[in-house]
């Protein structure tokens, strides 16, 4: 495992490094079958700015502690593509996937009140996150378009400022704690443990996503 990745490194090494980096690459719509091509070659073939790609990769890889070179020019279209695809992945794939398996797992719960509470908590969180990302789609991505055109960007609305003052992954941590402390079942617990693993993945994903937006887009 490398501490950081460079343009001359092989893309297949990056993809095989960790699940987190695999997810990052998928959000640039990069197909597999990369052979022995370098990161720069693969990015160029897929019309992705290599420098911006590496900033996001290394930022994620470091857990948000990566300080990219100050002379790095961030390509706004590449950044926008990554953020938009992250929204789609979370709202259309990962969270619905977790909910389906959550319902299956909770069917064997010994406490119907806890089952109801967990599903209700999850659904409320999904709606909150959906609203959060809808606001971002309108304001954050509009800011990216304005920046790319060289326009002076408008002041952030109170709504977008408000949703970026509290970590969006915090409630997922609360949901994990509810399941860990109060969920009981007489059946196989493999499914609920798998759900917890996916909640950890989602929590980290949202943490990095929020950090990237705050780093590049929130003054």
Regions found by a protein language model. Name each.
Residues 1-219:
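Small-residue-biased structural context
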């Amino acid at each position: 495992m490398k501490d950081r990745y460079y343009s001359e490194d092989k893309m297949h090494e990056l993809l095989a490094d960790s699940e987190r980096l695999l997810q990052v690459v998928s959000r640039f719509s990069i197909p597999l079958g990369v052979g022995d091509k370098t990161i720069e070659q693969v990015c160029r073939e897929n019309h992705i700015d290599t420098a911006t790609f590496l900033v996001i990769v290394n930022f994620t890889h470091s857990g948000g502690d990566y300080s990219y070179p100050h002379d790095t020019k961030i390509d706004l279209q590449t950044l926008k593509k990554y953020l938009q695809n992250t929204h789609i992945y979370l709202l259309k794939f990962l969270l619905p996937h977790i909910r389906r398996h959550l319902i299956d797992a909770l069917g064997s719960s010994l406490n119907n009140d806890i089952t109801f509470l967990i599903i209700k908590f999850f659904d409320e969180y999904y709606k909150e996150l959906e609203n959060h990302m809808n606001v971002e789609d309108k304001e954050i991505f509009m800011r990216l378009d304005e920046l790319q055109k060289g326009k002076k960007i408008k002041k952030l609305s109170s709504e977008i400022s408000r949703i970026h003052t509290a970590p969006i992954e915090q409630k997922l941590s609360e949901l994990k704690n509810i399941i860990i402390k109060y969920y009981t079942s007489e059946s196989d617990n493999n499914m609920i443990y798998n759900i917890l693993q996916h909640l950890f993945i989602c929590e980290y994903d949202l943490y990095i996503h929020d950090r990237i937006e705050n780093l590049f887009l929130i003054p």
